[in-house]
């Protein structure tokens, strides 16, 4: 499906619950939901058969702001305590059925796992890189723009993940 016109203009987020966040290595129940098999006349209900995860970077917020008061981009780093690795788990078969037109809901709110380690922004400072936006993309609106952020840059962090099954672990692979 083509991206909606607002994709390049608005930050994208998903619904989740703080109660579904746990430390990596914890087990969780496979989510239940509706799925629609190819060629089926009606959806069925049951456990997800297509589990997946997205490796992401989690941000730990150190202090808040007054309700309804935005935080200026130039002040945002002062509110961040550190970063961690985060696995955003998804039930892709449930998501395929429920995501249009409003986006995933039950397919993405059942589990999020985070690393037990956190890295401070101070430790990441040597990894800042110039921030640029592709010429064919619209420039951000003023409230999403900061000359200081452009000058300081963003963090150039590259992450990879590998999946290792119990069978692979037993075989030392």
Where are these regions (language model features)?
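Active-site microenvironments in enzyme catalytic cores
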Residues: 1-172
